[in-house]
Amino acid sequence: LGDVYKRQGMISVETYVNDQMVATYHGDGLIVSTPTGSTAYSLSVGGPVVAPQCACLVLSPVAPHNLTMRPVVIPSSSDVRLKVHARHAEISIATDNETCPIPEGAEFRVRLASRRFFLAVPHNISFYDTLRKKMMWGVDIRS
């Protein structure tokens, strides 16, 4: 999964989970990520690192204009509905390397696909080994 973002100017993203209003995010955008995507763009905007075994999605605001807006973790079975508004911004939606402009007021849904894919991972390397090695997780840099 990817993100909704602006090219210039501020956008507002009305966000509903299972038809319940969560919040209207005002800022540069909103990232909806899976556990696999949690260590990418979502992490860089302050989202949590999520273990791949967790059945969840993460909603991470990008440069929110309200300091109380924080990432939220929701069940992976959730139906996320987003409605995007912008006064003076060009709005795009991006998933992986594909970017598509969307019109003001566009509404769309995000949910897990019914199909799954399997990632080949060596049995002798755990998720936590990878965190420590690639992200220097818990490494003491004081020396």
Language model: regions and residue ranges:
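Short, small-residue-biased leader/transition segments that mark boundaries at the very start
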Residues: 1-5
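Gly/Ser/Thr-rich active-site loops/lids in small-molecule metabolic enzymes
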Residues: 24-27, 32-68
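A generic structural signal for short beta-strands and their flanking turns/coil linkers
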Residues: 9-13, 28-30, 39, 53-58, ...
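Short, hydrophobic/aliphatic alpha-helical segments
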Residues: 14-33, 83
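ATP/nucleoside-binding phosphotransfer catalytic cores, i.e., glycine-rich phosphate-binding loops
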Residues: 17-21, 70-143
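Generic signature of intrinsically disordered, low-complexity segments enriched in small/polar residues
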Residues: 8, 28, 44, 120, ...
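Generic, low-specificity signal for short hydrophobic/alpha-helical stretches with a mild N-terminal bias
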Residues: 12, 31-32, 41, 62-64, ...
